[in-house]
C-alpha cells in the first residue's frame, strides 16, 4: 500500500515531464493558432502616414494579408523583397503592423511622450520602406505591442490571411517565402474569393454565433508591415 501511494505520484510526474519535453521541442511555427477561423481582433491604430486611425473593419469585403514587421527585425529584411514582389504581381492588399518600433534603449536618456514616439517611429519606418520598398497599402503603428498580443504574435515577422468577413484563415510565423506564397497563400486566397461569392461562413460553432444576419461591407477609410 505504501509503495502504491508513492508510485502513483511518481508516474504522474514522469508523464508530465514527457509532455513538457515534447512541447518544448516543438517548433512554434508548427503549432496551429487558436485564432484560425475566428474573427480577427478589432483595433484602431494610427497609420504610418498620419491619415488617422485604421480598423480592420475598413477591409470587410476584401481578402487581405496582415503582416507584422519592424525596422529592427533582421528576418523582416529577408522577407521584405518577397512581399514587395508579391504585392506588385498578385494585387492582394497587404496591411503592415509596425510592431514595437520604439525599443527600451530609445528611452535611455529619459521617457518619451507619445507624440515623440510616434514621430520617431514614423521617421524610422518611412526611411526603411524608402530604402527597401513598400509593399503595404498602409501600415499602422503598434507602439506598445498590445494589438500584436491580441493576435498571438510569437515573433516578428508574422503574416495573417483575413477573409472578406474579417476572419483569420491562415497564419505564418517567420519570413514568408515565394514557395509559401505560391503553394499556401494564393491557393487559399482563390478559395476564399470563391467562398465569398457563395456567401458562406467558416463552419465553426463560434463563427455561427458571430455571423451577422446580412453581409456587411465597409469602404476603406483611406486612399490606399
Please give the residue ranges for each predicted region.
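Thiol-/selenol-based redox modules, centered on thioredoxin-like
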Residues: 161-225
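Loop/turn elements at helix/coil->beta-strand transitions in domains of secreted/extracellular proteins
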Residues: 61-63, 90-93, 135-137
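Short pre-active-site segment immediately N-terminal to redox-active cysteine/selenocysteine motifs
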Residues: 62-64, 68-72, 101, 155
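Conserved redox-active cysteine motifs that mediate thiol-disulfide chemistry
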Residues: 68-85, 99
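Hydrophobic beta-strand anchors of alpha/beta hydrolase catalytic cores
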Residues: 65-66, 94, 159
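A short beta-strand-turn-helix
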Residues: 43-65
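N-terminal targeting signals for export/organelle localization
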Residues: 1-44, 199-225
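Short, internal strand/loop/helix patches
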Residues: 112-165
